[in-house]
């Protein structure tokens, strides 16, 4: 039913990243999560038949970060998407624990769940499980990255996401600051999604705003770390103008740090931007604060991919993998923000 694919780049190591990658939307966060990585979409080949697709009645969604709001949203929307095709959706309860995730996946293999969509917490450790799934004739779809052993994958335009935010911030810097000022980046270098987003964000900004001084690049993917790292940056650079995050969660922590340091919420000389389309960030953008941009993923698009990619593998489609679209939202995009908020409700 499936074929193995050779990954074009080594996969990432331990990953908490998309726990905060909202949109995944993450959502996100989330999505949130989400990044050695290909700059462009990768597709896994698969073999099979249309009749195999008709027999696909169950899909297992293994999303380990069950404690975040995105999990509930993703399960709800994926269940509805599956139901349209007469498919029941199974879920794990990993509790953000890699050992629990491994145990739950082993159970699914023993039960021969016909299609598994898994967001590995530890990509290297998932290789053996994915290989065992393929050997058992099951479909394995990797969520948020790529494995050597897989039927297909679901990715989120990683590089483009960072590029959109970097470009938006650079344009704002030119318009509001005359191309001068100080910028700090909250980054991730632990997984494919994070590395690609980080590279897109930094490359786009520094290329388009060479007159803005880069004063810090700090690892942060969650609100608490973003808050702490931003406070440390502000202690050295209280006149920081721009803070860009690899996730909305980290950027939102920086947003709060700036306010705690005395920055007014609508300060005309401050720009915060993030990635995922996380609800707090979307609300801050809509309210006209200095949180001015998010590269947002639509939860409906992710949920549809969770169902459509395994179905495409089962049907024998040559390129079953999905690249979930991403779009930039800012203060003028009220309708788009409202639509994203509605999907997360």
Each model region followed by its residue ranges:
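N-terminal secretory signal peptides
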Residues: 1-13, 23-33
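N-terminal export leaders
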Residues: 14-18
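Bacterial lipoprotein signal-peptidase II cleavage site
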Residues: 32-46
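Hinge/cleft segment of the Venus flytrap/periplasmic-binding protein
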Residues: 50, 55-57, 204-205, 297-345
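Extracytoplasmic "Venus flytrap"
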Residues: 56-77, 81, 89-103, 107, ...
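Hydrophobic alpha-helical segments within soluble ligand-binding/sensing domains
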Residues: 101, 154-180, 195-196, 226-227, ...
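Hydrophobic alpha-helical
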Residues: 115-134, 201, 219-283
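Flexible loop/hinge segments that line or gate small-molecule binding clefts
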Residues: 124-160, 176, 182, 278-287
């Amino acid at each position: 039913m499936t074929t193995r694919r050779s990954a074009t780049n080594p996969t990432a190591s331990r990953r908490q990243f998309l726990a905060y990658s909202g949109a995944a939307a993450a959502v996100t966060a989330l999505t949130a999560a989400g990044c050695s990585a290909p700059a462009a979409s990768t597709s896994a080949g698969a073999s099979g038949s249309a009749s195999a697709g008709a027999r696909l009645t169950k899909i297992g969604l293994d999303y380990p970060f069950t404690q975040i709001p995105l999990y509930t949203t993703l399960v709800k929307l994926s269940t509805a998407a599956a139901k349209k095709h007469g498919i029941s959706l199974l879920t794990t309860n990993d509790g953000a624990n890699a050992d629990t995730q491994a145990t739950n996946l082993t159970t699914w293999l023993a039960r021969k769940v016909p299609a598994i969509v898994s967001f590995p917490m530890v990509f290297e450790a998932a290789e053996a499980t994915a290989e065992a799934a393929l050997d058992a004739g099951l479909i394995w779809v990797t969520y948020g990255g790529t494995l050597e052993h897989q039927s297909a994958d679901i990715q989120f335009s990683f590089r483009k996401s960072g590029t959109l935010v970097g470009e938006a911030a650079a344009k704002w810097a030119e318009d509001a600051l005359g191309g001068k000022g100080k910028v700090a980046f909250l980054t991730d270098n632990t997984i494919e999604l994070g590395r690609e987003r980080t590279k897109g964000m930094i490359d786009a900004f520094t290329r388009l705003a060479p007159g803005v001084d880069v004063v810090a690049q700090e690892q942060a993917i969650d609100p608490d770390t973003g808050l702490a790292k931003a406070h440390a940056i502000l202690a050295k650079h209280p006149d920081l103008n721009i803070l860009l995050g690899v996730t909305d969660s980290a950027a939102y922590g920086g947003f709060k740090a700036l306010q705690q340091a005395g920055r007014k919420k609508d300060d005309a000389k401050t720009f915060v931007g993030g990635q995922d389309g996380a609800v707090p960030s979307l609300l801050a953008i809509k309210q006209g604060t200095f949180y001015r941009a998010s590269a947002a993923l639509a939860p409906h698009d992710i949920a549809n991919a969770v169902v459509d990619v395994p179905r495409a593998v089962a049907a024998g489609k040559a390129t079953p993998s999905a690249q979930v679209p991403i779009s930039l939202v800012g203060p003028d995009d009220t309708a788009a923000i409202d639509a994203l908020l509605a999907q997360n409700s």
